[in-house]
């Protein structure tokens, strides 16, 4: 028995068939994209593993760093003798709080003739600038002198390194120290470093051959070659001068008030 089918019925069947094909194609594409996304996520997790909560908690928010730097460790052929001289820094702490030790001194004929130690707390106060505060001890020459002080260190415009500190000591003594240094990169390994240091005192200290006012200044020019960043030999020249009452005290002891000499040494850190 044949059942008559109208034209409208045939059209409806065709539309249903076409819709079913579209749904099947959509489901196939969705499955393919889903597998691709899962594969990409697996690759990402393999390359960048996610930290578990316990691992994240074990990582310190503010890690501790440390460093020891001998900026100068050198031989100097001064007018009266050959001298071993050093200028070193050591620090340990976090980005926000550090302990800093500065040490400068000289040895001549097996005896320490100059020795200055500074123990400072350091905290950043601006971009490229730190506030420093602490104590200082001068053990040579003469009688040991102790100070407390506050100052700044950092980079001025044109990358000029600055250390400036004001000190208050025993018996009403006051002092100020200033160090300026600039590193000129001639190549990636050849570096020229001019440096100036000066001391100013508020009172005479004849026992330690220190006069009131602008006391002394050192100006040097050093040329180093960095075999590695951590190790660099250098040569240079340095000029030292005493002024004012300090120069008068030196003359009264038959000591030179001006001197220029060659230096050769090593700069290293770890």
Specify the residue positions occupied by each region the protein language model found.
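Membrane-embedded beta-strands of outer-membrane beta-barrel proteins
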Residues: 88, 119, 150, 178-180, ...
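Detector for outer-membrane/organellar transmembrane beta-barrel domains
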Residues: 144-205
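Repeated loop/turn-to-beta-strand initiation elements of outer-membrane beta-barrel proteins
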Residues: 96-100, 127-131, 158-162, 187-192, ...
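Residues that define the transmembrane beta-barrel architecture of outer-membrane proteins
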Residues: 64-66, 82-86, 113-115, 144-148, ...
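Outer-membrane beta-barrel initiation region
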Residues: 8, 13, 38-111, 115, ...
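Transmembrane beta-barrel strands of outer-membrane/channel proteins
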Residues: 72, 101-105, 133-137, 164-168, ...
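Outer-membrane beta-barrel "beta-signal"
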Residues: 221-226, 257-270
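Residue-level signature of outer-membrane beta-barrel architecture
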Residues: 92-94, 123, 154, 168, ...
